[in-house]
Amino acid sequence: MKKINRKHKDSVFVDLFANDIYAKENFISLYNALHKTNLDPKTTEVKPVMLENVLYMSYYNDISMLVDGKIIVLIEHQSTVNQNMPFRFLEYISRIYEKITTEEDRFGKKLVKLPIPEFYVFYNGVENYPSESELKLSDAFLIPEEKHNLKNNDFKLEITAKIININVEKDNPILHQCEPLKQYSDFIKEVRDCMKENIENPFTTAINRSIKNGVLSEYLKRKSTEVHNMLFGEYDYETDIRVQRREAFEDGVEEG
């Protein structure tokens, strides 16, 4: 699987499932866990269709792959789940369709066949979020009072995002069906534990402990420096987000 070169930093999640030399095997393992299939990474074609400039900050946490007639879009969230994810996915998939089709396709009379989109958010933040849930684009629709009894299937446009909590404590079944995802979740827990201990070099310690415990050990031995730098970027990002939210809250309190 060809490595994606993008201008900003990728997260460890993206590197593990989209860029690393074993990313294809890891991604197929995750795909099989999501779909209860048994695709063989050696014979299954996987085509990256990731986009540039989808985030305003300094690193990427999105993966989009064309596989088995589907476009699988994965987002990792380490902070509060954004309730506007279906809207963001709508924008995202529109740009992907534009990317994989030609102008002639879009304006020609012949029907253009499009891969089926699927949207997943993998949550591993610290809030007590359900093991699995869904967000729908229709939840954001402005519905007149007299039509509040509309059902979801009454809407002409819908995007459904499946939210999967991959924190080890939630013990989501997918963690037992995809070993790379399970080890990634174990690693992130180790990172958080080291940060709570106020260790001078928490990322280095987390990497060393994980290698010792057999968690992503081959990957971490091979890419310890890169992983350290990715973690630094990710948690710097999370700090920035928390600061922005706190400042926005304080501004709101001051304004009354």
Task: Identify the residue ranges that each predicted region occupies.
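Elongated, amphipathic alpha-helical interaction scaffolds
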Residues: M1-E255
